[in-house]
Amino acid sequence: MSEMQPRPNDTLTRHMLYPFGNASFQAKSPPMLIEGGQGVYVTDASGKRYIDGQAALWNVNVGHGREEIKQAIRDQLDRLSYYSLFGGTTTAPPVELAAMLCRMAGPEGMVRAFFSSGGSEANEAAFKLARQYWRHAGEPQRHKVISLKRAYHGVTLGALSANGTQAYREHFEPLLAGFIQVETPHAYRNPFTTDPEALGRLCAELLEREILYQGPKSVAAFIAEPVQGAGGVIVPPANYWPLVREICDRHGVLLISDEVVTGFGRLGSMFGCRHWGVKPDIMVFAKGINSGYVPLGATLMNARVADAFLTPDEAEFTMAAFWHGNTYAGHPLACAAALANLRIVEDEALDRNAAEVGAYLLARLKDVQTRHPHIGDVRGLGLMIGIELVRDPETKEVFDLKRGFGARIADLCRARGVLIRNLADTFIVSPPLILERQHADTMVDAFEAAVAIVERE
């Protein structure tokens, strides 16, 4: 630890309970205080600069300190800081943003947007849309939601119930009834096959089998991330998503694409589902929608879903309305930031940059893997990459987590000016989409040096 910058004092933890944080650990090892950011870099309290290899939390896609976004927020703040979307009022930014989102997701058939304050809330809205859609469609018994094992959809109770990782769930059980998980197509860790096409087909068949077991007339929706994020960057086989769309169509099940991480270019295509050529019924966004400058989430729907809410009942207060909303839904500052952010994404073709630089970064990391046997797998798409350490590359046996190899490597990378996030012994590489090859080289060199040190220890 001698290579690390001095940690801030305990004032950073005395009154703060951090997300997913162990208060006892953080009392001894307070978090690093980030005080500045520009482009792909952030700066700590000592003035040391780091490549932000995690885009904060998968979300600062256009980079830190973008003047276009700051100016958009200032301009909107001068006009109107906040007003609600309730009670027959609205503001211009969410109206303009809804139109822009529906244009961008036009190839997927999206026609309406509903706003919230982040990804968990946006997924809650998706579940409520799905359930109320089926009530309007005359099938109120369709209430179940199927998701994948290892999935992450958020921390609110509905989103948590759709999560497929037990660690997120166990403290809060019993969770909501009607949420079911099926096997995820994890090429590196599955009990079935090493053939990607066979795996995609088998996992799709397991989904269909579960729909049939539950009773198709009881299933409202299937939700999945195009590439699983917090589950370890799990890239499905190419045939999986098209097969899922066919199965959902066959049984009338709504398909929800959770694009909170993958949306707006991270995978090298504007949306994750677009990479697979699949058109969902509902799409969920947050994070990259405005690169985290102001909290925002959005839930988009196609005409099938949206038209169900155009009922003959034209009363202002009616059970036909969508009975859901948040105080800060469509916040004008957040939406103004999103409009500026998405113009940058389109004008600078950041989806294409993610594809090109991401392929280069992935190839370099795979080359590192050939020299370090404890790197069991390197996987990813675009600028969304996972690196998994194993004790035994043949059996894929994991290290004892108490030894903290992943955290040690992340700390050594930090000492070399690179921030990457470790989830136990899997590393998440998800930098801003403006990353250049020179930044990728610095990241890879720091990571390999850190791995080499830990191997010798």
PLM feature spans:
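Conserved N-terminal phosphate-binding loop of PLP-dependent enzymes in the Aspartate aminotransferase
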Residues: 2-457
